[in-house]
A protein has these predicted regions:
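Sec-dependent N-terminal signal peptides
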Residues: 2-12
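Short, solvent-exposed loop/hinge segments that bridge or flank secondary-structure elements
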Residues: 22-49
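Short amphipathic beta-strand/extended segments with alternating polar/hydrophobic composition
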Residues: 34-38, 60-69, 143-145
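Central antiparallel beta-sheet cores of small beta-barrel/beta-sandwich binding domains
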Residues: 44-93, 173
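Surface-exposed, polar helix/loop patches in the mature regions of secreted/periplasmic/lumenal proteins
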Residues: 73-137
């Protein structure tokens, strides 16, 4: 098989068809890393009614989606599990919290034609064919506490660069 044909085979998205909030993605360069979308209270995140989760060998990270002015692309911003967010009270934050600029990680979403999505994904959208966030790996290595929304029990991890491709449709049973 020549190089171009091999590349085209690699770029073919898996044929998993399900709603965006049930699509499960696997990192092409390390199957131990999976990702997906979950419904989020739209009052907590202006740009999308979906949160993004990343499951690593050690923990699950949660992100809100952000798109500054609609012109700067889509970014992942560390957040908390939207299912637990309702249980979080309005207690004051630690004094040192909020002094650093929020961590924002460029997040690219592609269709099967490799065309980029013009806006952050939302409920009702078809499941993307590819997800890519180049700076997630470096954030897991250099900035893991901020990536875990301030959770100091988080630990440094190594994640290679790669695209996330659909692998399954979550049945919601687990």
């Amino acid at each position: 098989m020549n190089g171009l044909a091999f590349l085209l085979v690699l770029l073919q998205p898996a044929s998993v068809s399900c709603p965006i909030e049930r699509s499960v993605y696997q990192l092409s360069s390390d199957p131990a890393f999976t990702a997906g979308f979950a419904p989020q209270d739209p009052h907590l995140a202006f740009y999308s009614d979906l949160a993004v989760w990343l499951r690593t060998p050690r923990r699950t990270y949660w992100f809100s989606l952000e798109s500054p002015s609609g012109q700067g692309g889509t970014y992942l911003v560390p957040s908390v599990d939207p299912r637990a967010a309702a249980a979080v009270d309005d207690a004051p934050r630690d004094a040192d919290e909020g002094q650093e600029a929020p961590l924002r990680i460029a997040f690219d979403v592609f269709g099967a034609d490799l065309g980029p999505w013009p806006a952050p994904p939302r409920r009702g959208d078809p499941a993307p064919a590819f997800l890519f966030a180049r700076d997630l790996g470096p954030a897991l290595w250099y900035d893991w506490v901020r990536l875990a929304a301030g959770d100091r029990s988080a630990a440094q991890e190594v994640m290679p660069v790669g695209t996330f491709r659909p692998m399954a449709c979550d049945t919601g049973a687990g």
